[in-house]
Amino acid sequence: GDVKEDSTYFYVIGAPDIAAVPAGLHQGINYIDDNTVTLVLYAPYKQYIFAVGEHSNWMLQEASYMHLDPDNATWWVTLTGLDVGKEYPYQYFIDGTLWVADPLAEKVLDPWNDSYISEATYPGLIDYPTGKASGIVSVFQTAQPEYTWAIPEFTPPADEDLVVYELLVRDFVAARNYQTLVDTLSYLKDLGINAIELMPIMEFEGNESWGYNPSFFIALDKYYGTREAFKIFVDSCHANGIAVILDIAMNHAFGQSPLVQMW
């Protein structure tokens, strides 16, 4: 008859290694070189944390067990041997029960909403690791392409001289992306404005929202486009003498936010 093989993986969790965060590193993702990343997470009152993801084949491994700083609140781990320029999805596994994305990630993958983002708006969006993870996962990538600014230095108008047009990307252009928004700059400039204030563009819950329900404060919501597309929009605004102001709701955090889930 047919023979089926299976395997079971056990990992015995010991006490975390106590070691100081290397000098010069900040909370979040630290790119050491093209093959190395150090992740730093502020998470007081936790017993142990693993950084689990594509780099560890989504398994608990000694190499992904985070060190605990002597402050008893900051966790860190250095991941080596990474492929240059590859996007790695990952999560934090905390105290044996909680899986969360990195609260300071600059990009996340959403199993519920990413499928509704068009290729035109976000070309080349990597697949969610279905069957390996659940919930939102964060992403790191070494050797990211550098954007060359056409306007490397921009002096915004004085506060008292600002003529601001506030807009919601979702409702202002039918395509709902930065690429199309760039095409409207001549119209906005003809109105006599010298600043555009964008309603929140950081990752919020769902795709269609005013943005005042943020879940990741420094990750751009992919529904409006890529980081490069956003930079092109800002660069184009500056080329037209238009400042860009971001509406940020720092006092809000909703259920998908790791900062909510962790406490």
Predicted segments, located by residue:
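Short, solvent-exposed loop/turn segments at the edges of extracellular beta-sandwich modules
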Residues: 1-3
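Core domains of carbohydrate- and sulfate-ester-processing enzymes
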Residues: 98-151, 260-262
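Aromatic-rich carbohydrate-binding modules that target alpha-glucans
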Residues: 33, 40-87, 95-119
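Proline-enriched interdomain boundary motifs that mark the N-terminal boundary
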Residues: 17-24
